[in-house]
């Protein structure tokens, strides 16, 4: 596989394209901000309507979204086992 040649930024040549990339990325950040507000509203509803703490909601959301329950369980179990070993009375 051939190495890709590095491009050196030249404002005169690449400036307009860079501005387009920045504007495109900014548009995506604006959408993300909007979605984050929607998630915040859902988290508040879960707290108000179901009594679920916001921190717990966030942890469950991350666990569900990343679909890594097994990894989380294994890591948590490992930490608890080590804790019990180190701090056993």
Curated annotation (Swiss-Prot):
Keyword Membrane tagged: no
Signal sequence coordinates: none
InterPro entries named among the record's database cross-references: Double-stranded_DNA-bd
An annotated Gene Ontology molecular function: DNA binding
Classification via Pfam families: Phage_DsbA
UniProt keywords, alphabetically: DNA replication, DNA-binding
Gene Ontology BP terms: DNA replication
Quaternary structure (record): Homodimer.
Function field: May play a role in transcription of several T4 genes. Binds double-stranded DNA and interacts preferentially with T4 late promoter regions.
Name by which UniProt lists this protein: Double-stranded DNA-binding protein
Organism: Enterobacteria phage T4
């Amino acid at each position: 596989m051939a190495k890709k040649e590095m491009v050196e930024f030249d404002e005169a040549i690449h400036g307009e394209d860079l501005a387009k990339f920045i504007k495109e990325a900014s548009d995506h950040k604006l959408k993300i901000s909007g979605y984050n507000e929607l998630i915040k509203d859902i988290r508040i509803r879960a707290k108000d309507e179901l009594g679920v703490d916001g921190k717990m909601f966030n942890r469950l959301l991350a666990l569900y979204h990343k679909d890594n329950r097994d990894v989380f369980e294994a890591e948590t179990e490992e930490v608890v086992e080590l804790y019990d070993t180190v701090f056993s009375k």
